[in-house]
């Protein structure tokens, strides 16, 4: 344990996902393959939406931002986790821990708010189609984007300020593979009851409200679609049902992690792995690859790239 002369902890030791070498190797290989396949897919989504002038509807602005948020989010935990699998001593500095914690909550909070905005966009498009062009105009869309980024920033700053005010005088072992509020506050050498209540209010309540708001929005949309007699009824119901499943998969672990910070549970690490590494990589792919316009544009983009490569090879 490394502690400075003033008894302030300057680094944390990450105990990792598991102590079993065989399981570590298996998880390392799976996450590396998963990361190398799906992460480029997120950047392809961003590039496709940015390069196609036909994808200008608010939905595509939100899908592009979702891919950017999740690609950025995956950079916070996964690369370091992969490096730590190969290291005997898994150490992160105090400043590095605070930085990781800040970006986790900045991007995670922003993404939760973005999903709420996307649900509102679908509600307007399906239930109030005549008002879509006036309500979801470019100015309103960019204002919503600014608001969700600011919301994520404020949420994260509150978390960081609460952590920075805590004294850490040892021990310095975090029973996880990354730095997060739930594990860090357990190491503070002071009474944590009030701080944990504030954490529940900031993270847990925000997560729960986003979750309930999303479920309510899609419940209203599904009820409206069921009563409608349009050609796209089945497609709209399928899309909404898929998004509800995604919301359950995303917010279930988040609620599990942040609504009950007072006790450690056996499933904590696996839930954290799913929440911080696996789902952020899958999320934009699931949302976007159900959109026919994006898939068509992506195929055209890849076809042009292949043609250019073949032409370059022939000329040289």
UniProtKB/Swiss-Prot annotation:
Residue ranges that the UniProt entry lists as topological domain Cytoplasmic: 1-26, 78-99, 165-204, 265-268
What sections of the protein cross the membrane?
27-47, 57-77, 100-120, 144-164, 205-225, 244-264, 269-289
What are the entry keywords?
Answer: Disulfide bond, G-protein coupled receptor, Membrane, Olfaction, Receptor, Sensory transduction, Transducer, Transmembrane, Transmembrane helix
Task: Write the protein's name.
Answer: Olfactory receptor 4N4C
In which organism is this protein found? Homo sapiens
Functionally, this protein is described as follows:
Odorant receptor.
Which gene holds the coding sequence for this protein? OR4N4C
Under the heading InterPro entries, the entry gives: GPCR_Rhodpsn, GPCR_Rhodpsn_7TM, Olfact_rcpt, Olfactory_Receptors
Task: Extract one GO cellular component term from the record.
Answer: plasma membrane
Family statement: Belongs to the G-protein coupled receptor 1 family.
- Disulfide bond positions: 97-179
In what way does this protein cross or attach to the membrane?
Multi-pass membrane protein
- Give the UniProt subcellular location, in the record's own words: Membrane
Q: Which GO terms describe its molecular function?
A: G protein-coupled receptor activity; olfactory receptor activity
Any ranges marked Extracellular in the topology annotation, and which? 48-56, 121-143, 226-243, 290-316
């Amino acid at each position: 344990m490394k502690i400075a002369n003033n008894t302030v902890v300057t680094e944390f030791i990450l105990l990792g996902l598991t102590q079993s070498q065989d399981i570590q190797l298996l998880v390392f290989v799976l996450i590396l393959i998963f990361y190398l396949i799906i992460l480029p897919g997120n950047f392809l989504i961003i590039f496709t939406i940015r390069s196609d002038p036909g994808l200008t509807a608010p939905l595509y602005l939100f899908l592009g931002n979702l891919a950017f948020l999740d690609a950025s989010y995956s950079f916070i935990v996964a690369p370091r986790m992969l490096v730590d699998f190969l290291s005997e001593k898994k150490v992160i500095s105090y400043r590095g821990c605070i930085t990781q914690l800040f970006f986790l909550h900045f991007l995670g909070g922003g993404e939760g708010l973005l999903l709420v905005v996307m649900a509102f966009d679908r509600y307007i498009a399906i239930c109030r189609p005549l008002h879509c062009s006036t309500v979801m105009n470019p100015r309103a869309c960019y204002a919503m984007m600014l608001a969700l980024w600011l919301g994520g920033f404020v949420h994260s700053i509150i978390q960081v300020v609460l952590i920075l005010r805590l004294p850490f005088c040892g021990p310095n072992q975090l029973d996880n593979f990354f730095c997060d509020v739930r594990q860090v506050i357990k190491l503070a050498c002071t009474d944590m009851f009030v701080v944990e209540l504030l954490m529940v209010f900031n993270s847990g309540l925000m997560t729960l409200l986003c979750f309930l708001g999303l479920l309510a929005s899609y419940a209203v949309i599904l009820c409206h679609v069921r009563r409608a007699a349009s050609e796209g009824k089945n497609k709209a119901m399928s899309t909404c049902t898929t998004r509800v499943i995604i919301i359950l998969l995303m917010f279930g672990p988040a609620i599990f992690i942040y609504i009950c910070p007072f006790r450690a549970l056996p499933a904590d690490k696996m839930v954290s792995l799913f929440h911080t590494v696996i789902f952020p990589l899958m999320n934009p792919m699931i949302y976007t690859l159900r959109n026919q316009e994006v898939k068509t544009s992506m195929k055209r983009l890849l076809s042009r790239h292949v043609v250019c490569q073949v032409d370059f090879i022939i000329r040289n």
